[in-house]
């Protein structure tokens, strides 16, 4: 692996990537194991498991070995209120080299409707706030200190409201989802310091789908995909294929179009607890400068009213 040993070049690159002097489209944080926390990207995600509180956390370190590379952590909670209403909350922190820091706090509301004997569709709303902060103190640009570029003269500390929408069609064996979790575009430095617009965050559109094939009584195949589109950025497409053994051990491979190949594994430690890990091997032009990306998650189900009594109730597999 090659190294970039001049920190100010890395910091300047990352800063300019996220705070270009021209408008640009900033991608939301990405996760290889998105299928285990879909409520973060789609407020309509529904579990249809009354009395069960789903808790989860996920942490990702991207491009390990590249100074100033992003790291992302998220926590989420989701539960049905009754057979038609489900609600959730999520918190996400995205940090880029201790220069750019974004915190998102959202609440989700989903309304579930039956459309057949085994099929349901839910419609969801997401509302919350994005808090965007920068720390340019001590940053060295290629042109010199921060006083050599008006865009970096002052730190930024701003909050932006956000609204999102989504739809989720599902059965026990497959799902399709479409969502726009950030409907309100934001401009982090609009008309400040003589700059027309810096750091534009545009609307992201997500389309997800997956199927659970029963190979035999102990083996299931779970292909899935996620497509993500945002103005000014190329289409992002994740394709994964997992196998589930004895409803406990799950492992799979994935590919992110033009970006990375991934391997993931998770284990159901108890009926209520699952832990997992994923590794991404970078295939784009940054691959020479990092050793890949790592991601861990934990999922925990809380039986609020003792409905499960220690046993599964026709468990869902997504």
Label the model's feature ranges.
Residues 26-318:
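Subset of outer-membrane beta-barrel
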Residues 21-25:
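Sec/Tat signal peptide C-region and signal peptidase I cleavage site
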Residues 1-2, 27:
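N-terminal hydrophobic targeting signals that begin at the initiator methionine
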């Amino acid at each position: 692996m090659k190294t970039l040993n001049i920190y100010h070049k890395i910091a300047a690159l990352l800063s300019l990537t996220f705070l270009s002097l021209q408008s640009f489209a900033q991608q939301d944080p990405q996760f290889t194991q998105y299928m285990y926390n879909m409520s973060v990207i789609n407020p309509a995600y529904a579990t249809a498991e009354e009395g069960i509180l789903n808790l989860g956390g996920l942490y990702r370190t991207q491009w390990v070995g590249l100074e100033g590379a992003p790291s992302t952590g998220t926590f989420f909670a989701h539960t049905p209120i009754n057979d038609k209403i489900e609600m959730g909350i999520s918190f996400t922190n995205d940090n880029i080299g201790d220069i750019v820091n974004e915190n998102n706090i959202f609440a989700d509301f989903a309304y579930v409707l039956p459309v057949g004997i085994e099929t349901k569709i839910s419609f969801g709303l997401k509302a919350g706030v994005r808090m965007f902060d920068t720390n340019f103190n001590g940053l060295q640009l290629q042109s010199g200190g921060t006083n050599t570029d008006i865009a970096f003269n002052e730190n930024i500390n701003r909050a932006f409201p956000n609204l999102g929408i989504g739809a989720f069609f599902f059965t026990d064996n497959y799902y399709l989802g479409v969502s726009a979790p950030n409907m309100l575009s934001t401009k982090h430095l609009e008309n400040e310091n003589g700059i027309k617009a810096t750091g534009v965050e545009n609307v992201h559109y997500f389309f997800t789908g997956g199927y659970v094939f029963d190979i035999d009584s102990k083996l299931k195949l779970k292909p899935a995909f996620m497509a993500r589109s945002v103005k000014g950025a190329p289409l992002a497409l994740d394709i994964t294929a997992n196998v589930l053994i004895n409803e406990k051990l799950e492992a799979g491979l994935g590919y992110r179009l033009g970006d990375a190949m991934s391997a993931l594994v998770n284990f159901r430690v108890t009926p209520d607890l699952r832990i997992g890990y994923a590794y991404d091997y970078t295939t784009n032009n940054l691959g020479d400068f990092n050793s890949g990306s790592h991601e861990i998650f934990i999922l925990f189900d809380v039986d609020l009213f003792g409905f499960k009594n220690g046993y599964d109730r026709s468990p869902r597999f997504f």
